[in-house]
Amino acid sequence: MKAAILATAAALTGSALADVAHMRRGHDSFHHRRAMHAQEPEETCGCTTEVITFYGSPTLVPISTPSATPTPAPAPETTSTEEVTTTLHSTSTSTVTVTATPETPEVTLPTPGVTSFSSTGVYTIPATTLTVTDTTTVCGATSTELPSGTATYGGVTTVVETSTTVVCPYATVKPSGSTVTSVIETTTYVCPSAGTYTVVPPTTTYVPTSTVMVYPTPATFTPGTYTQDAQTVTVTRTDYTYVCPTFHPELPSSSAPAPTTSAVPTTTAVPTSTVVPSSTTSVPASSSSSSAEVPQTTGSGQMGMTYSPYTNAGGCKSKADVLQDIATIKQKGFTHVRVYSTDCSSLEWIGEGAKQQGLIMILGVYIDSSGVSGAQSQVTDIANWAEWDLVSLIVVGNEAIQNGYCTASELASFITSAKQAFKAAGYSGQVTTTEPINVWESSGSALCSSIDILGANIHPFFNSEVTASQAGKFVQSQVDILEKICPGKDVINLETGWPSKGSANGLAIPGTSQQSEAIKSLRNDVGALSVFFSFSNDLWKSPGAFDVEQYWGCIDQF
């Protein structure tokens, strides 16, 4: 099992966007695998024109003969009579206007809003809150950026372990007069044996230039109050289409409190189509279309903590120990827990603890040296588990490109396939991967279309010119760079921290007091968008670069 979790340390290259001194170095061994029914839609009302045609019997209309001009009297036997018959149709037209009053007021559901920007600039979309009283499935919307040429989008793929009949709802468009209407249909697909099947084929299209394609997807909403966070959108090209992230339900009062300086602004209005230009440069809020709350992406706080259920010897912790650890994470004020893979009963035990404590999970699909094919079973495990109310984000791969386990194109394809499997199992939240900044700079063009939010691991210690007190500012500078790589997509820092023991890396000095100083800086500057690494020291790892790999445990700093 150890062989599956060890990785070769790789040095990060410089960046055209960031100073070489601000690049993360030699940090790959962190990431080893041990390591809304709504009220029924009202009927369409309008004006109806009724045309009634009456048909009568033919009527004979005699034609008067003009007075005769005096002429010599004709012989009697030559007298003749002429009769002319004309048939008329009588038509009567009546117009009846019917005005219907809906029995119930219109219900607005928290489906994603689609906004088009005709010019470049920075725009702010205000926050909105809606209440849903009944469960319903409607057409939502999602988007993907297509490269120029022939491309595919949409579709549903499922993974089965035995002969199975799959009944799958899917969204499509149908002609309606001179326009098209999004509708939900259901297909039944027979999977004859274990394997991966395309239940709903993707759509193939041709675009002359890079285009953001918006298309319908099924969305089910259960009763509750849904909030859509304010969005700051940086538009870098004209005629840009932006799909607002789906609303997320508010957590019950028993859940852990959100960071005090990043409360979600709300209104009682229906989502507005007005977009207000803004000069703000703050990081846009991240959101999720799943039923779990997603963290704010600006300001101070302590959003998440990474957790690996391993003992110091590298074995699996007991269920009791796992539940106690998850309780501690909640007691320390965190709202999210990040899990790297599905081994050691992570889904079941950590999931149970998260449910008990009101925590939200960031799930992981770990890719090791076996490549993307070796990670397929984890996708199946997560799809079968399907406790989506606990999940806000699924991270497919953890520095897999950095470690040389797959190429960017292989990872992008695997993410797309995994997203389809999760969606077929009922998941409507976000999916991403995570890599250091240099990989995003070199491979962002291949990855951006497959992810919903940009995930990065940002560790200031591996920059030799960053002191512990500068950790937060350094991470924010890296986030600023990452925001430009996948325009319109938020950034989440999925790993950050500081070691408590080891050798110095220039100005970056490990130690207990330095860790405390760094954690304080990170909490103040980027805590609300960051997952702290890690819950406890990982003594089962090898020492690694600067002998620090075992000493990142930081739960006691909170």
Curated annotation (Swiss-Prot):
Superkingdom, natural source: Eukaryota
GO CC annotations, alphabetized: cell surface; extracellular region; fungal-type cell wall
InterPro entries per the UniProt record, alphabetical: Beta-glucan_modifiers, Glycoside_hydrolase_SF
Signal peptide from the UniProt entry: 1-18
This enzyme's EC code(s): 3.2.1.21
Biological pathway: Glycan metabolism; cellulose degradation
Residues forming the catalytic site: 399 (proton donor), 495 (nucleophile)
Lipid metabolism in keyword set: no
Biased composition range(s): Low complexity: 76-105, 252-292
Entry's Gene Ontology BP terms: cell wall organization; cellulose catabolic process
Enzymatic class: hydrolase
Location(s) in or outside the cell: Secreted, Cell wall
Catalytic activity: Hydrolysis of terminal, non-reducing beta-D-glucosyl residues with release of beta-D-glucose
Region (Disordered) residue spans: 64-105, 251-305
Keyword tags: Carbohydrate metabolism, Cell wall, Cellulose degradation, Glycosidase, Hydrolase, Polysaccharide degradation, Secreted, Signal
Coiled coil: none
Alphabetized GO MF terms: glucan endo-1,3-beta-D-glucosidase activity
Main location: secreted
Database matches in Gene3D superfamilies: Glycosidases
Keyword Signal assigned: yes
Family note: Belongs to the glycosyl hydrolase 17 family.
Function: Beta-glucosidases are one of a number of cellulolytic enzymes involved in the degradation of cellulosic biomass. Catalyzes the last step releasing glucose from the inhibitory cellobiose.
UniProt protein name: Probable beta-glucosidase btgE
Protein species of origin: Aspergillus terreus (strain NIH 2624 / FGSC A1156)
Lineage, top ranks: Eukaryota, Fungi, Dikarya, Ascomycota, Pezizomycotina
